[in-house]
Design a protein with these regions (language model features):
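Short, well-formed alpha-helical segments that are part of the catalytic scaffolds
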Residues: 6-26
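Glycine-rich, basic loop-to-helix element that forms the pyrophosphate-binding segment
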Residues: 56-73
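Short beta-strand-to-loop acidic/aromatic patch adjacent to the donor-nucleotide binding site
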Residues: 78-87
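Conserved nucleotide-sugar donor-binding
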Residues: 135-148
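A short, conserved alpha-helix in the catalytic core of glycosyltransferases
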Residues: 143, 153-186
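Non-catalytic, C-terminal membrane-associated alpha-helical segments of glycosyltransferases
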Residues: 222-275
């Protein structure tokens, strides 16, 4: 097993160095893709010759960078790719245990391995054919070659869902190791007062993120008509509700909702061009 890792940066903070350090010791190569228009990543702070750094001062999204990472693996004979978010890290010996589980699994039809990002998860068994998130997942490069590139129409939000569905359509599998945990941020959270006058914490996404969530979900519902159960429209409605009730840009969010529907209808995909 030759394992490369990739992380995609966008306006990161200094926690990125600690996060990368939580897994770089067990990978053979570390690919860092910087989508920031004004990059400030200092690879010297990690003290490793494993790092390959890419920056073109342009936000290319998630799918394009993952395709670059997979192509690098193909060209340099890496068998697997660990994909991480900039705000994700492994705890304790989790990454070493994770890799050992993969090495001990002889099923050649597993295209993607995933981990649990919910600290409250107490389940110990592995689950087959779950929709995995990219952060913390390990991709089988040979099967990724067979099903084709990540869909760059999606840009962000839904890239991982589409990839998993295409694995299923080609009779490959995913596996989720519940007992392997990562620390992972699901977005900005804020303290709120609910309509029932209770104090709570809610994830509140930006209007741009809401745009991608809606447009890409509509796109995937057409692309994969037999897998609507994988797309979790109810979760997106909840994100919209939180943005409208507790966000600071309600009017902009409403415009983003209409723009997402319009762009989907007009087949305007990829990166959102701000007017």
């Amino acid at each position: 097993m030759r394992l490369a890792a990739s992380v995609i940066l966008y306006k990161h903070d200094d926690t990125i160095y600690r996060n990368i350090s939580s897994y770089i010791q067990v990978v053979d190569k570390m690919l860092v893709f910087d989508n920031s228009e004004n990059p400030n990543f200092d690879q010297n702070l990690i003290h490793s010759d494993k790092i390959v750094y890419y920056s073109d001062r342009n936000n290319q999204g998630i799918a394009h960078r993952l395709n670059q990472a997979i192509l690098y693996c193909i060209n340099n004979n890496y068998s697997h790719l660990l994909t991480m978010d900039q705000d994700s890290s492994f705890t304790d010996n989790a990454i070493a245990n994770y890799i050992q589980l993969i090495k001990d699994n002889n099923d050649i039809n597993i295209g993607m391995y995933g981990v649990c990002y919910d600290e409250t998860c107490k389940v110990e068994h592995a689950a087959i054919n779950e929709i995995l998130i990219t952060s913390g997942s390990i991709i089988n490069i040979s099967l990724a070659e067979k099903i084709g590139n990540f869909d760059e129409n999606i840009f962000i939000d839904g890239v991982d869902t589409d990839f998993c569905i295409r694995l299923f359509q080609n009779e490959y599998k995913t596996i989720l190791y519940h007992k392997i945990k990562i620390k992972h941020s699901l977005g900005e959270t804020k303290k709120v007062i609910t309509p029932y006058l209770k104090k709570s914490k809610r994830a509140v996404h930006s209007s741009t993120r809401i745009y991608y969530l809606i447009r890409n979900n509509l796109y995937l519902r057409v692309k994969h008509p037999n897998h609507h159960h994988c797309l979790k429209w109810g979760n997106i409605l909840n994100e919209i509700k939180n943005a409208l009730l507790y966000g600071d840009e309600r009017a902009i969010t409403i415009r983003a909702i209409f723009a997402a529907r319009k762009d989907f209808k007009n087949k305007c995909f990829g990166k959102l061009i701000q007017s």
